Amino acid sequence: MVADLLCMVGFFATVVLIFSRRAKRFQTNHNRALDALAKHHGFGFNPNHGWNATVMNGTIGKHRCDVSFETVRRRSRRNRSRTYLHVSVSLNGPSQLGLHITPQGFLSEGLQLPDSLTGNQDIIIGEQAFDEKYRIKGFDENAVRAHLTPKRIHAVLQAQASLGPLHRLSLTDQQVSVRFPGLISDMQTISNTAKLLVWLADQFEA
């Protein structure tokens, strides 16, 4: 019986060791790929990001771009965590509207009580596709409506269509950004996303 127990412990220890080595190998290879991407764009690279900080930053066109990781700890007995990748592009002429545009709906917000009960703000712009897809907040509703011209609304919808439904596009007074639902191993996807956000920032500053 003791021998069986030792065999079982040895088996599980071996499995843990294998997965640990694979995870370490993935992290090493992923960091190398990120470093190569940073060098391609002439960005500064932070090798000590620890999966919860800025990884690289620099300039594309006229805009500053940041790529970062965010690790969120889940409240559970297993103490699980999830890591997201963020790509953000700063606006050169930030507005003072208190603008905050984020995806809405069950996939983005989870179960929510009606806004009439929670008092959660959602400015209606008057463009059905845009209003249904995004929650819009700001200090002055009329100023926000004036700021979100048909051209800018179309640019946001076009960018979201290029990204896909699982990539969380959001906008504020200061920046446009995308949150990926996990680590992205395809460096070209990260590069293309940064360029897309630069294009979107240009549409808001045209």
Q: What would you call each of these model-derived segments?
A:
Residues V16-H40:
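Transmembrane-cytosolic junction motif
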Residues V9-L17:
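Hydrophobic core of alpha-helical transmembrane segments in multi-pass integral membrane proteins
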Residues M1-V9:
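Feature marks short, highly hydrophobic, charge-poor N-terminal signal-anchor/signal peptide-like helices
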